[in-house]
Structures are given as structure tokens and as C-alpha cells.
Amino acid sequence: MNLGSLVSETRNPDTLDLDALPTLEMLRRFNEEDKRVAYAVSETLPEVAKAVDAAAAALTRGGRLIYMGAGTSGRLGVLDASECPPTFGVPHGVVVGLIAGGPGALLKAVEGAEDNAQLGEDDLKAIGLNARDMVVGLAASGRTPYVIGGLKYARALGCATAAISCNPGSPIAEAAEIAISPVVGPEALTGSTRLKSGTAQKFVLNMISTGAMVKCGKVYQNLMVDMKATNVKLVDRACRMVMEATGVTREEAEAVLTQTEYEVKPAILMVLTGLDAQAAHARLAAHNGFLRAALQP
């Protein structure tokens, strides 16, 4: 396998003098390269949309959204998964991040783990993967055996699958139903895919998880109304969301939130409809948690 032929491994002609540049000019070069990321991701939006719809469908049928990757890619998946419970109020374990080598690999590289295709399958078996789930494989190179092994196993079970890589026509793209390949070009630091490639993957993960949660009723307007108010900052945000969605004062927002144990969706519904807390919860349940639908007469 000629890894040197991968776009992500080639040398960038615009940064050949990186080690001779003054600090500010070096940072300008980094910044110019970073500007390419958003455009590269924009070219993949039709495929990202398919992944969002597939993820939302998996969550709606009681399945999970599972990310898997090695190194930087794996860490990005774990990061995105860990943000979903506080942001969208989903239970831990609904969005899962797997990294080659296990949790210890988040802090220290586990040598050889990414080269083991069987390990990818084994990690999915260990969490009880089933056909209701969706698996998203991440690898900047697009050829990580751990991810390929996992995707092949997931497809054999009938899971929805997507692959995110930064090299076109990659093996993981071929292993998944949905291929998302933002080609960001050579890195400023040759082969350091934690730079543009990592940023592109994070952009895509942000869209997949956020988009899926919007489609699952976790958002009203552009407010994260299923957020868990677990600290002072988030309690304040809950108050502001109720105020912004309904026009009430802070005191009124706080009063209604105390009746819902600081759950924002029923609080908004109570203010806008006059329902009590119990009835607001019941109406939300009848509309599968979609606040906009619950507000319709």
C-alpha cells in the first residue's frame, strides 16, 4: 500500500518553508489552509444530509448512533458523543464513541490497535450492536483497518453505515453505504491529519449529531430545549430560553421552570398554552417530544 500517494500524506507546496517563517506569517499560512476546510465540507453536504436522515431514523426506531475511529478521528467521535447528553438530553449510551485501543487511547496512543480489523468488529460486538443502530466510521486516511472491520460487520448485521474520510475513493468509503469525503488537500504539516482533516471531520460530526437531534424533536426554533440544566450556567440558559421563546420576564420563567424541574420544553408549553405541568408533559408525550407540534391547536 502506497500511503504516500494519499492526498492527506502529500507535501503542501505553500508551506515548504514552515520552519523558517516568523510566527505571525506561520500562523497566516495555517489560517489560509484552514479556510479551505469549510468549502471542502460544503461539497459533501448531499452525503452529510443522507447521514443525518439515517442517524435520525436510527434514533427514532430506538437504535444508537455509534462513531468509531482511531487516533485523532476516534477522539473526535468520542468528543461529539460525550456532548450529546448534556446538550440534547439523550441518555448516555444513545450516542457512542469507540476508539481503537479503548478509553486509554484517548490520552495515550495504543500501538497497533488501529491496524486490527477484528478489533473493530469485536468492539461493536461488545456493545451489542444490532440492526437498529447506525455506525459512522472515521479515518482521515480512509484506510484504517479497525474502522473497515467495524463497518463491514455493521453492514453484515443490516445497520445503516457512513464513512468520513479526507481522501477520495477510500476503502472506508467503499465499506459504507454513505461516503462523506471532504478533500481538504495536503496538510500544512505533512501528514498531520489532526489539522485540516481533523477540523473537517469535526465539522461533519457537528452536523450529523446536531441535525439528527433537530429531526428527533430536541430543538425548538434554534433553542436546545431538551438541554439538561445541570449547573449555574445552564440554569441561566434555561431561563433565557423560556424568556426568548415566550416573552415572559425572568421571574416568570424561573417560576414556571421550578414546576418542571428546569425542563425547558414543558415550561415553554405551559406558558404558551396555559396548561399545568402534568398536562404539558402529557401533550409533549402525545407528540413524541416535538414542541412545535405540541403547540399546534
UniProtKB/Swiss-Prot annotation:
Keyword line: Carbohydrate metabolism, Lyase
Domain SIS: residue ranges: 55-218
InterPro entries linked: Etherase_MurQ, Glucokinase_regulatory_CS, MURQ/GCKR, SIS_dom, SIS_dom_sf
EC number: 4.2.1.126
Active site: E83 (proton donor), E114
GO BP, sorted A to Z: 1,6-anhydro-N-acetyl-beta-muramic acid catabolic process; amino sugar catabolic process; N-acetylmuramic acid catabolic process; peptidoglycan turnover
GO MF annotation: an example: carbohydrate derivative binding
Protein induction: Induced by MurNAc 6-phosphate that releases the repressor MurR from the DNA. Repressed by MurR in the absence of MurNAc 6-phosphate.
Associated pathway: Amino-sugar metabolism; 1,6-anhydro-N-acetylmuramate degradation; Amino-sugar metabolism; N-acetylmuramate degradation; Cell wall biogenesis; peptidoglycan recycling
Catalytic activity annotation: N-acetyl-D-muramate 6-phosphate + H2O = N-acetyl-D-glucosamine 6-phosphate + (R)-lactate
Highest rank taxon of the organism: Bacteria
Pfam families: GKRP-like_C, GKRP_SIS_N
Main EC class the enzyme belongs to: lyase
Job of this protein: Specifically catalyzes the cleavage of the D-lactyl ether substituent of MurNAc 6-phosphate, producing GlcNAc 6-phosphate and D-lactate. Together with AnmK, is also required for the utilization of anhydro-N-acetylmuramic acid (anhMurNAc) either imported from the medium or derived from its own cell wall murein, and thus plays a role in cell wall recycling.
Note: A lyase-type mechanism (elimination/hydration) is suggested for the cleavage of the lactyl ether bond of MurNAc 6-phosphate, with the formation of an alpha,beta-unsaturated aldehyde intermediate with (E)-stereochemistry, followed by the syn addition of water to give product.
Family in the record: Belongs to the GCKR-like family. MurNAc-6-P etherase subfamily.
Quaternary context: Homodimer.
Protein name: N-acetylmuramic acid 6-phosphate etherase
Organism, scientific name: Cronobacter sakazakii (strain ATCC BAA-894) (Enterobacter sakazakii)
